[in-house]
């Protein structure tokens, strides 16, 4: 019910897609699974494409990003990733988070560097640890979470602190 009403009264803002810029990162192509604010911030520096849940394979295959950047998004641009990343209580969960797993496998198979950034640590460490485990590089905003990531990430994955000013 809440989702249905929400779609009727709220129109998500549009994020500029694939706009080249001057500067050191102006040609860097970044495919994103991120909320609106992060997407807009990154779109000012590099070429971005928001990955849709139903068409990410085509975007990856045709656009050929230099990097896939996934953040601890609760909705994603246009609400595409709502309830598809964070661990949800059973009474809310509509389905298992298969799409993000398939995306992570696809970019791994294609050799595209991929990172996960938990901008919501430490409060939402547990909500996003399953997603973090899918990526070879994990960044957190909270350095006190580094030992937790070291203990829970698969061998070969690396966790570090990333402060990304807006």
Please report, for each region that a protein language model flagged, where it lies by residue.
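Internal alpha/beta domain cores that form substrate/cofactor-binding pockets in large enzymes
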Residues: 16-64, 68, 72-112, 135-136
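Membrane-proximal basic amphipathic "stem/tether" segments
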Residues: 1-23
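Catalytic core of nucleotide-activated saccharide and alditol-phosphate transferases
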Residues: 4-12, 108-166
